[in-house]
Structures are given as C-alpha cells and as structure tokens.
Amino acid sequence: MLHTIQAELFQLTRSKLFWIIEGLLFLLIFVSSFGEASFSLYVSTPSGQDEIVRQGWTGFQALNQVAHDFLPFVMIAVLVLTTSLLGRDLTKKLYKNTLASGLSRKEFYLFKTATLATTSLIQLATVFVTAFILGSIFHGAGRMPIDFFKSFSISFFRAYAFIMACSSAFACLLYLTYSTLASYLTFFVLIMLQASLHAIFPQLNSDFFTFLILAGSLWGGYQAFQHRDL
C-alpha cells in the first residue's frame, strides 16, 4: 500500500492543478503576511493618553493566525486535490480497471483514504511552515511562548482533524453520487447548515462535532462504495 500511496502522490505532483493550488496558497499567505505588516495596539502612558504602537505578526504569531484564519483556504485546496485524487476515478469509473487488476474494494478504499490523509497532512504542514518563514522574514521570529509546543500541537491536531473531516465528507459525497458538481454543491450546503447550527446552539462542542463528521463520513463512504454496482 505504501508504494501505491507514493505513486498517487507522485502523479499528483506532476499535474498542473497541484502547482496552481500550491501557488495560490503561497500567494495568499504572502499577501496576508505582507498585508498584516502592522496593527494598532493602544498602550497607556504616564501622561494618561493612549499611545498607538505599531506592531506586526511575527513568525510565531503567524502560526496562530494560520490555525484560525487560513483553514478555509486550506480546506478548499484539499477539496480540489481530493477531486484530482478520487473524483476522476469515480466519475469516469476508472476504478474498474484497478479492481480488475485484483485489488478489492476494501483495499481500494483504504489506500485512497490513506492517500487523502497523507495529502491533507502534507498540505497543512506546508502552510504552517510557509507562514512561519514569511512571518519571520517580514517581522522576525518573535519570542516563543513558554507553552508553545503544547498549544501548537493542540492547534495543529485540531486543524488536521477539521481538514480531514471536510475531506472525508466530500469523499463520502463522491462515493454516494459519483458526481463532482453534486458533491461540491451538497458539501457547501452542509457547511452552511453546520455554521447555522453553531450560531443557534453555540454551546455545542465543535471538536466532538468534527470527530463525529469524520467518523460518519469514513463509514458512510466505505458502505456506499462497497454496495455500489460496477
């Protein structure tokens, strides 16, 4: 399975779509890092007047920004990559050739899921590293917080769980519909419904909701593909 995943990733990196997505993400991070060059911070002085101090996002502050502000962009990028990795096989029914070579449906589903998980992890890590480097170039690395490793690990894990939940939900829709357009439309309708649900019930545990979507999507996609007629 490892060699199959490597082959899928290698094929993905040879596509123009992959580099277009990566270029757009880099441009967004670059513009945002450059655009956030300063923000107003009011500091009380002994004279009783507030003094405006100009500061910028440092490398460590950029990591926090990515964990909150850039996840929607990463999500869209991963959805496009999911379409490239899985959508083409399902919509054009190219998976039949793979199954005819002796691979079972379970094995096909597992290696596709593993490939999507690996792609999401690499994509997210790349965005964090790029943001840190650009933030450090523009404004310096800054002072590392005392609890940096703990807080960053939690933020990264939550971000990865969110990206994987979105990717799995979209993949589940692809397995159900075999239609890229229908999957995109349904996915964004579900996103809006989820946002409305959180607005109405803010006390809902978002982490639990994320893992519920992740588990349900993985199970639903597997069942849909297992019982789908060739």
Predicted regions and their residues:
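Transmembrane helix boundary and interhelical loop/hinge segments in multi-pass membrane proteins
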Residues: 82-100, 113
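Hydrophobic alpha-helical elements at and bordering transmembrane segments
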Residues: 5-12, 108-109, 152-157, 225
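Structural signal for the C-terminal ends of transmembrane alpha-helices
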Residues: 33, 87, 195, 219-226
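Secretory targeting signals
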Residues: 22-85, 110-180, 187-188, 195-198, ...
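Short coil/turn motifs that cap or connect alpha-helices
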Residues: 104-105
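Junction motif at the cytosolic side of a transmembrane helix
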Residues: 5, 11-12, 212-230
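Alpha-helical transmembrane segments and their helix-entry boundary regions
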Residues: 18-21, 98, 108, 182-184
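Aromatic- and glycine-rich beta-strand/loop motifs that create alpha-glucan
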Residues: 1-25
